[in-house]
A protein has these predicted regions:
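Catalytic cores and adjacent binding grooves of peptidoglycan-active enzymes
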Residues: 5, 10-18, 49-58, 64-114
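Short coil-to-beta-strand
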Residues: 1-2
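Extended, low-complexity, intrinsically disordered C-terminal regulatory tails
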Residues: 18-51
Length: 114
């Protein structure tokens, strides 16, 4: 199951883009196969860095939580590997376990740097 629930406020998606709909589809596939709920915590909402792709509807943040709360780190590791393998190469970035991304996984579609 996919759940849309912001950490500080509601999740807002201004103009769903095909590139990110594919990410949501892959999240749903992982969720069904792993038997977990993937929570999308941010799309085009609250504050992000000035050049963030969240504002262009080309990025999302998500997490998988343990039953009692807290991030399910090993499941998040599996999710990061799954997305890296299943999203087409070239423009998708999966950011996990880097500074600022220790509690959520960030996925963006960014061809600017290539």
């Amino acid at each position: 199951m996919i759940e849309f629930k912001g950490l500080r406020e509601g999740v807002r998606w201004v103009h769903p883009r095909d590139e990110m709909l594919l990410v949501v589809k892959r999240l749903a596939e992982f969720s069904a196969r792993a038997g977990v709920t993937v929570r999308i915590t941010s799309l085009n909402d609250h504050s992000h860095s000035k050049r963030s792709l969240h504002y262009e509807d080309l990025a999302l943040d998500c997490q998988v939580l343990k039953r009692g709360g807290g991030v399910a780190m090993s499941t998040m590791d599996r999710l990061a590997r799954y997305l890296t393998a299943e999203l087409p190469g070239g423009c998708y970035d999966v950011v996990w376990r880097t500074p600022g991304h220790e509690r959520h996984l960030h996925v963006e579609f960014d061809c600017r740097q290539r």
